[in-house]
């Protein structure tokens, strides 16, 4: 069953922007391991709070990504940029929806010009 992994990250003092850049970079690499999508959220009320969300069809693909060389290097390189422990949660996707975005329609003036 397809799953969504949620990984909460909390940056240490003055490291939020650096952690954001690295989370964006390493999240994009997840598709090499079979991820079907990813999102990185940053809190508006708390700019040090991040949520990395990755979707995989197979839990084993997630395990390969998390233990792979890129994520290992990320955790070594960014050591001290985030609070530990980092505890992720695998969730089964049971329902999904998405709004269809349409281009706005501009009405013509009543006189036709």
Summary of predicted features, one role per range:
Residues 1-72, 83-113:
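Short S/T/G/P-rich N-terminal loop/turn motif that feeds into the first structured element of a domain
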């Amino acid at each position: 069953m397809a799953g969504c992994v949620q990984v909460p990250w909390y940056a240490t003092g003055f490291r939020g922007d650096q952690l954001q850049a690295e989370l964006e970079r390493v999240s994009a690499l997840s598709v090499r391991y079979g991820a079907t999508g990813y999102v990185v959220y940053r809190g508006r009320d708390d700019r040090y709070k991040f949520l990395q969300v990755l979707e995989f069809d197979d839990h084993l693909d997630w395990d390969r990504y998390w233990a792979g060389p890129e994520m290992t290097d990320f955790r070594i390189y960014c050591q001290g940029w985030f609070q530990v422990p980092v505890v992720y949660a695998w969730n089964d996707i049971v329902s999904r929806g998405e709004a269809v975005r349409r281009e706005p329609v501009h009405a013509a003036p009543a006189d036709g010009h």
